[in-house]
């Protein structure tokens, strides 16, 4: 038998709608926002890697 946890009880309402299609756009807008934030995160990491984003006191030396 599966063990009940507090986290499981919190997440249960999300799983109760499994297999059903939300009317309209549903959570598409929220997904788009998170994708945009993830893109910004990746761009910042890329700029740090290319040293085009200079951070004071943070030396990036790849050839040790």
UniProtKB/Swiss-Prot annotation:
GO: which molecular function terms? phosphate ion binding
| Keywords for this protein | Membrane, Photosynthesis, Photosystem II, Thylakoid, Transmembrane, Transmembrane helix
Q: Which proteins does it associate with, and in what oligomeric form?
A: PSII is composed of 1 copy each of membrane proteins PsbA, PsbB, PsbC, PsbD, PsbE, PsbF, PsbH, PsbI, PsbJ, PsbK, PsbL, PsbM, PsbT, PsbX, PsbY, PsbZ, Psb30/Ycf12, peripheral proteins PsbO, CyanoQ (PsbQ), PsbU, PsbV and a large number of cofactors. It forms dimeric complexes.
Q: Which Pfam families match?
A: PsbH
Described function:
One of the components of the core complex of photosystem II (PSII), required for its stability and/or assembly. PSII is a light-driven water:plastoquinone oxidoreductase that uses light energy to abstract electrons from H(2)O, generating O(2) and a proton gradient subsequently used for ATP formation. It consists of a core antenna complex that captures photons, and an electron transfer chain that converts photonic excitation into a charge separation.
Location(s) in or outside the cell: Cellular thylakoid membrane
Cysteine disulfide partners in this protein: none
**What topology in the membrane does the UniProt record assign?**
Single-pass membrane protein
Q: Which Gene3D superfamilies match?
A: Photosystem II reaction center protein H (1.20.5.880)
* Main subcellular location: membrane
Q: Name one GO biological process term.
A: photosynthesis
Family note: Belongs to the PsbH family.
HAMAP family attached here?
PSII_PsbH
Q: What is this protein called?
A: Photosystem II reaction center protein H
């Amino acid at each position: 038998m599966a063990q009940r946890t507090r986290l499981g009880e919190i997440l249960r309402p999300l799983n109760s709608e499994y297999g059903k299609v939300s009317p309209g756009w549903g959570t598409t807008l929220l997904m788009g926002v998170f994708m945009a934030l993830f893109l910004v995160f990746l761009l910042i990491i890329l700029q740090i890697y290319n040293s085009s984003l200079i951070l004071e006191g943070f030396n990036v030396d790849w050839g040790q």
